[in-house]
């Protein structure tokens, strides 16, 4: 299936290592202050699936209301190989998407991204688009809590990357490095440890963001 931006340019699925094919989308402060927590059964799930499962838990428990934002696309070509199934063959982005998730927690507006990297020692800034960064800036100026849940897939490590740290490296990338050192994320971000319910207890990190905002 081919997706196009509003200007007609075809979407490059390989440009951003964090984003799988949209076909699939359509169909050092440890929170527990323990650097060696056991990782529970996270194999086989994408970061997005893990966050969605965690959001469902938070919603069912009346803790927070957080949802994945829908992808703004216009479908232009559909095949019907079977009566019971339709296959999207071509679609256009109606507009540039912003961030992956938003919601409300303890009266605070949350707006955040979910990103994965196979890098071991740093997180590449190419995982972000300029409009996503500017969207987070705008939300934060209005008092929103903005961040990115970062997963280092080779080590199964999760962190909350505060928006301010992202902004710092984003603004300096033309003069300096084009990635955020993992050591910096460990020092100034918040480590998340897998649990059972919720799978990713990221609101514990959000509590620390709120406390330090």
UniProtKB/Swiss-Prot annotation:
Enzyme superclass (EC): hydrolase
Reaction(s) catalyzed by this protein? Answer: Endonucleolytic cleavage at a junction such as a reciprocal single-stranded crossover between two homologous DNA duplexes (Holliday junction)
Amino acids binding Mg(2+): 98, 100, 113, 132
Where is the major localization of this protein? cytoplasm
Q: What is its EC number?
A: 3.1.21.10
Pfam families annotated for this entry?
Answer: RecU
InterPro entries according to UniProt: Resolv_RecU, Restrct_endonuc-II-like, tRNA_endonuc-like_dom_sf
**Annotated cofactor note:** Binds 1 Mg(2+) ion per subunit.
Could you tell me the keywords of this UniProt record? Cytoplasm, DNA damage, DNA recombination, DNA repair, Endonuclease, Hydrolase, Magnesium, Metal-binding, Nuclease
Specify the domain of life of the species encoding this protein: Bacteria
> Cellular component per GO?
cytoplasm
**Site description Transition state stabilizer, residues in chain:** 115
Q: Which terms does the UniProt entry file under GO BP?
A: chromosome segregation; DNA recombination; DNA repair
Q: Name one GO molecular function term.
A: nucleic acid binding
**Where does it live in the cell?**
Cytoplasm
Identify the cofactor(s). Answer: Mg(2+)
Biological function:
Endonuclease that resolves Holliday junction intermediates in genetic recombination. Cleaves mobile four-strand junctions by introducing symmetrical nicks in paired strands. Promotes annealing of linear ssDNA with homologous dsDNA. Required for DNA repair, homologous recombination and chromosome segregation.
Its family remark reads:
Belongs to the RecU family.
Q: Which HAMAP family match?
A: RecU
Q: What is this protein called?
A: Holliday junction resolvase RecU
Q: Specify the species.
A: Ligilactobacillus salivarius (strain UCC118) (Lactobacillus salivarius)
Q: Which gene encodes it?
A: recU
């Amino acid at each position: 299936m081919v997706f196009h931006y509003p200007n007609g340019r075809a979407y490059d699925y390989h440009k951003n290592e964090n984003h799988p094919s949209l076909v699939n989308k359509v169909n050092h402060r440890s929170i527990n202050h323990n650097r060696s927590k056991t990782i529970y059964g996270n194999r086989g799930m994408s970061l997005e699936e893990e966050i969605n499962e965690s959001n469902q838990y938070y919603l069912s428990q009346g803790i927070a209301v957080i949802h994945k934002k829908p992808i703004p696309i216009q479908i232009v070509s559909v095949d019907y190989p079977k009566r019971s199934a339709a296959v999207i063959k071509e679609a256009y982005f109606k507009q540039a998407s912003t961030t992956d998730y938003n919601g409300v927690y303890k009266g605070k507006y949350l707006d955040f991204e979910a990103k994965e990297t196979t890098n071991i020692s740093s997180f590449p800034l190419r995982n972000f688009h300029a409009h996503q960064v500017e969207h987070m800036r705008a939300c934060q100026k209005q008092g929103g809590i903005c961040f990115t849940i970062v997963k280092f897939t080779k080590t199964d490590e999760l962190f909350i990357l505060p928006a301010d740290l992202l902004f710092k490296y984003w603004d300096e990338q033309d003069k300096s490095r084009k990635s955020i050192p993992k050591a910096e994320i460990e020092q100034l971000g918040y480590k998340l440890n897998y649990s059972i319910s919720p799978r990713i207890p990221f609101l514990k990190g959000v509590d620390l963001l709120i406390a330090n905002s």
